[in-house]
Amino acid sequence: MERSYDIVIIGAGAAGLTAAQYGARANLKTLVIEQTANGGQCLQIEGLENYPGFPDPIDGYDFTERFERQARQFGADFAIATVSRLEKTGDRFALETSEGPVDASAVILATGAKHRHLGVPGENELGGRGVSYCATCDGPFFRNRRILVVGGGDAACDEASFLAKLSDKVTLVHRRDRFRAQPAVAQRVLDNPNISVRFNTVVREIHAVKNPMGIEQVGAVTLEDVQSGAQQRVDMDAVFVFVGSIPQTSLVPTVAKDEAGYIVTDQQMETEIPGLFAVGDVRSTPFRQLVVAAGEGAVAAHRATHHIRVLEGNVYQEVPA
């Protein structure tokens, strides 16, 4: 990893990888920093069905690999590292990473969001021992077992449908009286004989049992009917939680955010700090989809290119947004 770039992109999901492609294609020295594996939450997708140009379902790994390959072909650099500090000094941004310092003229935040927890007893204690936030990662461990899915959005319904391929004992609970998921996604769940749906229901506690090796793992849950208040203990072997996300904004504590903590930008994806952009799941937007995130990445890279050209004194005629 070199030390000086035109654009540094933090995060390698659909938004970050698209920004990398457009930045590198503009002949700008572009670096993508990802702390784990490139792809972000795309990697959890078992079958992507609604991305334009892909009439047949494609899994998240293959989808990500195509994005990354295209960005590399245009010359983008990639690094596996953690960014611990980001600050602006003059016209440049300084970043401290686990692989050393880096500076850039523009930074695109594509840091995404992490899974929101239920906050109930037993959840943290049994993480990795039956409590999971990724069905494609951990679902195969619970083939033909009793599985509980929590949530009512697209993610919960998609993951429940995936888990129903592994077990005919899947229960989906949602605190409201109807799904928030897109109608087609929700209907797939309602039509699946392997999925039992319980509306107006929340999880109050996750209980442990000891396996033959003496290790505690998920054994049951306490469910509560939000209308009657009645509680019921139900035997379960796994709990998969999909109840929303928390934007990853710790690098920019003073940047403007909406009431939910997502970064606020203008239509060009730029924050109130010139040269600092936010795209994808970390950004305040009414509609979170991969195709939207990719579009945001392209817009941010285009605007970052203009920002850099201004700094260089090489301004081109802008096309109105």
Go through each PLM region and give its residues.
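Glycine/Thr-rich phosphate-binding loops of Rossmann-like dinucleotide-binding domains
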Residues: 117-118, 157-158, 180, 231, ...
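FAD-site-proximal beta/loop scaffold in flavoenzymes
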Residues: 119, 124-141, 241-292, 296, ...
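Glycine/small-residue-rich loop that forms an oxyanion/phosphate-binding "nest" at active or ligand-binding sites
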Residues: 78-140
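A Rossmann-like FAD-binding core segment of flavoenzymes
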Residues: 71-97, 101-103, 165-267, 306-321
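Residue-level detector of alpha-helix initiation sites
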Residues: 13-14, 37, 113-115, 154-155, ...
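Phosphate-coordination loops involved in phosphoryl transfer and adenosine-cofactor binding
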Residues: 4-6, 80, 99, 143-145, ...
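Beta1-alpha1 glycine-rich phosphate/pyrophosphate-binding loop at the start
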Residues: 5-74, 145, 157-183
